[in-house]
Amino acid sequence: MSATVEFARMNGLGNKILVVDMRGRSDKVTPAAAVALNADPQTEFDQIMAIHDPKADGTDAFIDILNSDGSKAQACGNGTRCVVQALAAETGRKAFTFQTVAGILNAIEHEDGTISVDMGKPVFDWDRIPLAEEFHDTSRIELQIGPIDNPLLHSPSAMSMGNPHAIFWVDKDVMSYDLARFGPLLENHPMFPERANITLAQVTSPTTMTTRTWERGAGLTLACGSAACSAAVSAARTGRTGRKVKINVASAKPPAMLSIEWRERDDHVIMTGPAEWEWSGRLDPATGCWSRDDAREVEAQ
């Protein structure tokens, strides 16, 4: 095993996150290591958030994000909150600025332990989401699943929140749909040349929504922060809600809410929610071999 690094198993609303400290190193967590870690029931995850030394002035770190299949992700809101909690515990600071491949993220930990992340501006242009076909209005695109005359799902809102999202509006409980069956079909639909995150969204009031997500590169997930942001923005964009909503993530464990604001003054999306540390260890970023840090657990207790 090469020199190991510290990592923490965390979650954001049940979204399984591995936060890996790669600071001071020039190598990266490899796709092979990600696949190996996800194959182990003790370390299976939705995203890896690898913290690297900053590359840009005015930032605290560069965050490299991997999905459980080893592919790259551009954004992960729940994972970003986990990184903030980990670094706040380490440094005593509350505010951080991160660079990702999708851009700059600003985040702050509040006194109540919740964390707000400025996810930046949403993208609606069809060729920047991207979509395979030109749509003048991406708030409702032509896509459906099921019989032509009685589709199960149809006419999603499409956008990017650093990564591509399709939001399907439903009237029934989002848990009543077999998302595990048709999620992969929609994720890999030819309409999405870079694949897409697929979310079912039910508007329950002008200020509340319920969502469930099939995550690109990770599959059926307990929660997805960028999907919640995309659902909130798409709901406001189509007149279903206002710009401030509470998102009930239907499959989150434990049950919890995300607060999303699509800020009018600058169009930035602000996501606020919890993060939770579970346990820590060390891993080889090349192979995914790992060990648990029992001493840290005793200290935390």
Swiss-Prot record:
Substrate binds at residues 15, 47, 67, 77-78, 163, 197, 215-216, 225-226. Keywords: Amino-acid biosynthesis, Cytoplasm, Isomerase, Lysine biosynthesis. Its main location: cytoplasm. One of its GO terms (molecular function) is diaminopimelate epimerase activity. The active site is at 76 (proton donor), 224 (proton acceptor). Belongs to the diaminopimelate epimerase family. This is Diaminopimelate epimerase. It is found in: Cytoplasm. The lineage of its organism: Bacteria, Pseudomonadati, Pseudomonadota, Alphaproteobacteria, Hyphomicrobiales. It is an enzyme of class 5 (isomerase). It catalyses: (2S,6S)-2,6-diaminopimelate = meso-2,6-diaminopimelate. Catalyzes the stereoinversion of LL-2,6-diaminopimelate (L,L-DAP) to meso-diaminopimelate (meso-DAP), a precursor of L-lysine and an essential component of the bacterial peptidoglycan.
